[in-house]
A protein has these predicted regions:
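Conserved C-terminal structural/oligomerization subdomain of aldehyde/semialdehyde dehydrogenase
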Residues: 1-94
Length: 94
C-alpha cells in the first residue's frame, strides 16, 4: 500500500512526510537539487527516495526505519558496529 499526497509547497511536503508515527521510508518528486538535498537531510525516515518509488531496497545497504517503523537494529552489512549511529540511505534520480 502506498500513498501520494500533493503539497502546495516544499515546506508543506516536508511537514507531511515527517508528521507520522512511522518512518521506514519517505520520498519526494522534484526537479530541484536544493529541495532534494534538504529533504534527504531533514526527512525523519530511515530510507529516503528522490524521484523514485519508496518500495524496494538494495539488499547490500543497511535497511531499517525510524520512529514506529522497523524498531531495533538495522539489518544487513556491517551495520552492527554502527548500532549507535543514525544512518540514512538516500536515492536521487536525475
Amino acid at each position: 500500500c502506498a500513498s501520494v499526497i500533493k503539497a502546495d509547497d516544499y515546506d508543506e511536503a516536508l511537514h507531511l512526510a515527517n508528521d507520522t508515527d512511522f518512518g521506514l521510508s519517505a520520498g519526494i518528486c522534484t526537479t530541484s537539487l536544493k529541495y532534494a538535498t534538504d529533504f534527504r537531510k531533514n526527512s525523519k525516515a530511515g530510507m529516503v527516495m528522490v524521484n523514485l518509488p519508496t518500495a524496494g531496497v538494495d539488499y547490500h545497504v543497511p535497511f531499517g526505519g525510524r520512529k514506529g517503523s522497523s524498531y531495533g537494529p538495522r539489518e544487513q552489512g556491517g551495520y552492527a558496529r554502527e548500532f549507535y549511529t543514525i544512518v540514512k540511505t538516500s536515492y536521487i534520480s536525475a
